[in-house]
Amino acid sequence: MTLTERLREKISQAFYNHGLLCASYPIPIILFTGLCILACCYPLLKLPLPGTGPVEFSTPVKDYSPPPVDSDHKQGEPSEQPEWYVGAPVAYIQQIFVKSSVSPWHKNLLAVDVFRLPLSRAFQLVEEIRNHVLRDSSGTKSLEEVCLQVTDLLPGLRKLRNLLPEHGCLLLSPGNFWQNDWERFHADPDIIGTIHQHEPKTLQTSATLKDLLFGVPGKYSGVSLYTRKRTVSYTITLVFQRYHAKFLSSLRARLMLLHPSPNCSLRAENLVHVHFKEEIGIAELIPLVTTYIILFAYIYFSTRKIDMVKSKWGLALAAVVTVLSSLLMSVGLCTLFGLTPTLNGGEIFPYLVVVIGLENVLVLTKSVVSTPVDLEVKLRIAQGLSSESWSIMKNVATELGIILIGYFTLVPAIQEFCLFAVVGLVSDFFLQMFFFTTVLSIDIRRMELADLNKRLPPESCLPSAKPVGRPARYERQLAVRPAMPHTITLQPSSFRNLRLPKRLRVIYFLARTRLAQRLIMAGTVVWIGILVYTDPAGLRTYLAAQVTEQSPLGEGSLGPMPVPSGVLPASRPDPAFSIFPPDAPKLPENQTVPGELPEHAAPAEGVHDSRAPEVTWGPEDEELWRRLSFRHWPTLFNYYNITLAKRYISLLPVIPVTLRLNPQEALEGRQPQDGRSAWAPPESLPAGLWEAGPKGPGGTQAHGDITLYKVAALGLAAGIVLVLLLLCLYRVLCPRNYGQPGGGAGRRRRGELPCDDYGYAPPETEIVPLVLRGHLMDIECLASDGMLLVSCCLAGQVCVWDAQTGDCLTRIPRPGSRRDSCGGGAFETQENWERLSDGGKTSPEEPGESPPLRHRPRGPPQPALFGDQPDLTCLIDTNFSVQLPPEPTQPEPRHRAGCGRARDSGYDFSRLVQRVYQEEGLAAVRMPALRPPSPGSPLPQASQEDGAAPEKGSPPLAWAPSTAGSIWSLELQGNLIVVGRSSGRLEVWDAIEGVLCCSNDEVSSGITALVFLDRRIVAARLNGSLDFFSLETHTSLSPLQFRGTPGRGSSPSSSVYSSSNTVACHLTHTVPCAHQKPITALRAAAGRLVTGSQDHTLRVFRLEDSCCLFTLQGHSGAITTVYIDQTMVLASGGQDGAICLWDVLTGSRVSHTFAHRGDVTSLTCTTSCVISSGLDDLINIWDRSTGIKLYSIQQDLGCGASLGVISDNLLVTGGQGCVSFWDLNYGDLLQTVYLGKNSEAQPARQILVLDNAAIVCNFGSELSLVYVPSVLEKLD
């Protein structure tokens, strides 16, 4: 067993056990799932409800003044200002954005030195801001006069009293953690602990105290022991009550003068006004709510077609709850991890969750309802999950692989989308496995088996398409009707689509192909590829710079890499470069401080990194507040009992401050315990975690090497994952038996396929067929040309029927018996007995005359067989107590007297019958059929009207052994019947008159097969030879001649051995040794004749000149059946159970397939399928172009060869007293038609499809004429 098979088995077993668990304990699992949903949705309280997010409006800073309170616009005048933009805001927010770094980085610096010195400068900056005073002609303005004065905090915030300002200006900075006391900060040995002591015990959330004081999200601050960034970012937040433009301008100018930012190009042009809503905006909810309503309606109306579901609306509601809970859990978990769903991917994310969740619901529902309904509920759930386990895990693994690749693209938008997608997939998988599966088990448990049996026939566990309205007679017959005659073996679902209601076909198509998920995955891959190709992060440029700087020629041997000025402008660097660590070396164009270049070029002894981490500014720094939680400002003002509902605040342009700190200052500002505490890097960790990179030439650390190696490692990992993904897609799309015939699908009974595997039960009807009776023994040969039907039984009797009405037109008796029309039920050979009793008198008898010896008047009409016989009921002995002496007897013959074969010995009834004949006034009768004549005794001759002329060598009467031989083959065209006998005799009969037109008995070898095509007759013989005959006739072979009904008792006027004046048969060609053994199959089409023999070969002849074109070898057994059509497609089947397809034009074998366990008994083709049957009573349908088996139909015993093709997409098969119609394209059972009680015990041995959409079924000695139901004609 391979690794894949073992893994698949373990996954299947795990899902099976999980299904048992969910179905066994549904209530506890639903309660547990509900608690998990509530726990994961708890962080949603920190998010705005849909439609309640803040709304923004921007105005220029220049000439800004607060809008008036009564700002009424003229009626009809368009206004760009929103309605809420009236009056002064609650407050003006001014953020001083500080970026600081210690440079150059020394080798003996600790990790705590990254943020201790930058944070200590916050106290100095706060002091500078508080001491700033504006002096102008109007006087002086200080911060206390323009800032927002706050009072006490809310009573419930006692733990924050020493951290947030009270009774003064609302000014926030990281120094608030230490009450703005530098000494307290300097004495703190655990800065990280102090910052995080007020954080929640769970994962970091938005709008925490750290975010309020730092003014930036925690991951952007750089305050961490394990960060690779050496830049610390924070803001000093000032809240003003009134807008004073001069004070703000002077404050900005002073800070930028004291702490310049040369490479900063942040724009200070606009104020952003943010309005906070109070009520839910219904308009924003309409699209999403409409989507979920449509989802509910679609699932509900679709599940109405699934009868295996008890509560349709309950299942639809459970599906909607599953999808909605998955969405809420995803957003809640993202919020818990600090991800605020504000990007474009987050906006489209609810709709992606709907699509993916809908498909997973459909997959589980389809899998569970397709399990056998007679199993216990928990076993059905377990089997359903187990059957889809591998598919579910493959899809989840594929999606996670794509997400992993996307995360390593280093593009922020893709990374954030991938994080959302991971959380969404995990939450959706959890809910599908626990919540929806459990709800489905509860629903199916309600669908009790007793409730099903009320609507289902006993022989199948399928819901009836029309459960009501059955007549009482139909219900009674259900108890005695045999089981379903078919067992259908279906290939994997990729090869077929069942004919279902359109809703279910759409649902199961989505569930089977997972189209939406695959389209989403493909779209994600394309999106990631486009972003990587366009290189928004500048990765290729960065790598090129790294390769240039790492050249073995040294840094001085190569000049700076020429980059066009439009690519990396010095004044406004590309914002995408902000994703690189600040310590990564930049191109010379970005280094705008020329005074530092000589210092960097000559590294000093003991310096760890010669380059200072460049502090860069980008446009994203202008509105850093957007990365904060939307509750950031409402939370801050709520602490002081100030509400922002239905009000707005104004955010002033950010003031950038850059701090470049000396390493010596970092060493001087270090706390004494820092060297002995956990700040020092442990020896067990690699130096690369703390240091920038390995040492380069000259003792320096080449940090670029680590980055280059990291990118190479990520690229290698992404390549490996991509290869594995392609392999998985190949295994998913290409089955294991791709290109190989047949499949490994196990054969199952119909009871194991509830509702035909997809909730659809084919209808069952019962009709009274047109029964054609008249044969005494089993019918062996059938032939038809569309208008006439010819049948021959083992007794040698040939009957001609009208295929339209079912009337018997004439009978051709076995030689020696009198031919009669079809008014009676058997040959009237009794007249021969009467003539024998009259001493061999051969007087002619006119048609319609009664026998001359009939004297007794008859009572009620009796059957024609006993119409001229006395009443023998008095001879019946009902005294069964008397023991008669035993006499040697033999079994009674199955046929009536005079129908062909005489008995050698038996009981002599003449002693009993002779007395009755004498009483009736009839002469003594000899019983020649019961007393065989002695050899050499002369036999009385019948008249010429009896069909046998009194010539020498004429055949004996019916009770004597026939020298003409039995009929082995039969063909019909027009009004001519060609008969091939075992004696080698070829006969041509008139189908209407029953007259022998011509015959040929030159060869004594029996005729095993015949072809009658375009006035050419080809006879295949037992000795392997072929005879080609040409038929000449002066009359048309048009079927219009059949309209007249011949008169009864008409007989030929000439001898059976003489040729007719209108029809002549001439032997044109003979192939004496066409095969070495008897020919068993013969077909002709498109000017070609194909023969199959027991010598394992086929031969192709040209029909016009009997020239042998090809000898085809490919079977390992005798050929049993051959098919050829006008398109020159040749198929053959043999005793080896194989089917071969051949190219008639070249003689080459196209395909070879082992189809049956035994002989192939029948073979036919359509434009797209090859249909075969065998002695194993199995009907196989194969794809004609690929040779792959589509499905199999298991027939009843003895019905294996009973099949017929009505059209290219309609197949009819026979069973025990019924015929079934199948859709060849889809492989589903369309309808089963029962042929009444008389045929229930008889298997349909042979089916012949006529041109008028009628079907002739051979039930032994009777034929049933069935017309195709109208519903099938519509489908066709």
Curated annotation (Swiss-Prot):
Residue numbers of Phosphoserine PTMs: S821, S837, S843, S850, S905, S934
Gene from which this protein is expressed: SCAP
Transmembrane parts of this sequence: 19-39, 280-300, 313-333, 345-365, 402-422, 424-444, 519-539, 709-729
Protein name (database record): Sterol regulatory element-binding protein cleavage-activating protein
Ranges where the record places region Disordered: 60-81, 816-903, 928-957
Effect the entry attributes to changing Y234A: Abolished interaction between loop-1 and loop-7
Loop-7: annotated span: 535-710
Taxonomic path: Eukaryota, Metazoa, Chordata, Craniata, Vertebrata
Lumenal side: 40-279, 334-344, 423, 540-708
Membrane topology classification: Multi-pass membrane protein
Residues in the Cytoplasmic compartment per record: 1-18, 301-312, 366-401, 445-518, 730-1276
Modified residues (Omega-N-methylarginine): R1048
Record function comment: Escort protein required for cholesterol as well as lipid homeostasis. Regulates export of the SCAP-SREBP complex from the endoplasmic reticulum to the Golgi upon low cholesterol, thereby regulating the processing of sterol regulatory element-binding proteins (SREBPs) SREBF1/SREBP1 and SREBF2/SREBP2. At high sterol concentrations, formation of a ternary complex with INSIG (INSIG1 or INSIG2) leads to mask the ER export signal in SCAP, promoting retention of the complex in the endoplasmic reticulum.
WD repeat ranges per the UniProt record: 771-811, 949-999, 1002-1039, 1074-1111, 1114-1152, 1155-1192, 1194-1232
Keywords: Cholesterol metabolism, Cytoplasmic vesicle, Endoplasmic reticulum, Glycoprotein, Golgi apparatus, Isopeptide bond, Lipid metabolism, Lipid-binding, Membrane, Methylation, Phosphoprotein, Repeat, Steroid metabolism, Sterol metabolism, Transmembrane, Transmembrane helix, Ubl conjugation, WD repeat
